[in-house]
A protein has these predicted regions:
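A Rossmann-like FAD-binding core segment of flavoenzymes
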Residues: 1-35, 39-42, 103-199, 240-248
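FAD-site-proximal beta/loop scaffold in flavoenzymes
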Residues: 52, 57, 62-79, 173-219, ...
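Residues that mark the start of a beta-strand
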Residues: 68, 83-84, 107
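Glycine-rich Rossmann-fold phosphate-binding loop(s) that bind the pyrophosphate
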Residues: 89-91
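N-terminal Rossmann-fold NAD(P) dinucleotide-binding loop
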Residues: 94-95
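Generic hydrophobic/aromatic pocket-lining and core-packing "Φ" positions
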Residues: 98-99
Length: 248
């Protein structure tokens, strides 16, 4: 982008608002992006604000992050090949993480806080098959109290007091999308507060687009987010060409 003269700004966005609340017939409102130190006019806005992985909050989690504590089996599972691994979570994401890790781990322990693994039927059946093979073990009504190790994950301590040797632990208890800026403009969210987009990466609000982990798309990978952003860019260019955007 910089080779074409596009300026890059490293500023925290505080607010995005419509420039004109009631634009004249035949025109559409542009947007004003407010940062901590400036305001910028924009004919379209792409929200690529991402999401935060929901943290477990156990002692040792922060210290050992990227040292055996991970939030993405697809990203990091292969680094711990042959080791005993664990997954914390009780939903479909946890089931899918465990299944993926079972291809790399000597064994996968799944710690479920409740009394049921609430996975999609197909994934539930696949987990049961792996349990029968001895590749996965599911521990119900079980919570991790502490993640232990000096320079890497070595053990997990359960709230029951039991300690288990572990080479890696994957936290799969959900994500927190950073969608508030978009929501304030009337952008539609799903029940997980992810931004709803269509195949053009458009939101329900004209001129507003979204891409990456903040969206309701299934796969949360850098390459898929990049593809969504490219798609949004094409359609934003088309939008600007078809509409007269005004700021007053």
């Amino acid at each position: 982008a910089t080779s074409f003269g596009v300026p890059l700004k490293s500023e925290k966005v505080m607010d995005v608002r419509r420039a004109v609340e009631s634009p004249a017939e035949g025109t559409v409102s542009g947007y004003v992006v407010k940062t901590g130190s400036n305001e910028y006019k924009a004919k379209t806005v792409l929200f690529a604000t991402g999401s935060h992985h929901r943290k477990l909050g156990a002692p040792g989690e922060e210290k050992l992050e990227n040292k055996g504590v991970s939030y993405c089996a697809l990203c990091d599972g292969a680094f711990f090949k042959g080791k005993v691994m664990s997954v914390v979570g009780g939903g479909d994401s946890a089931a899918k993480e465990a299944l993926l890790l079972s291809e790399h781990a000597s064994k996968v322990h799944v710690f479920v806080r409740g009394d049921e693994l609430k996975a999609e039927p197909v994934n539930s059946d696949r987990v049961k098959a792996k349990v029968e093979e001895g590749k996965i073990e599911v521990h119900y009504n079980t919570e991790v109290a502490e993640i232990m190790g000096e320079n890497s994950v070595e053990k997990v301590k359960l709230k029951s007091g039991e300690e288990m040797e572990m080479g890696a632990i994957f936290i799969a208890i959900g994500q927190i999308p950073l969608s508030d800026l978009a929501a304030n403009l009337g952008v539609e969210l799903n029940d997980r507060k992810e931004i709803k987009i269509n195949r053009k990466s458009e939101t329900n609000v004209p001129g507003l687009y979204s891409a990456g982990d903040v969206t309701d798309t299934q796969f949360k990978q850098a390459i898929t987010g990049s593809a969504e952003a490219v798609t949004a860019s094409f359609w934003a260019f088309d939008y600007v060409g078809r509409n007269k955007v005004v700021f007053e």
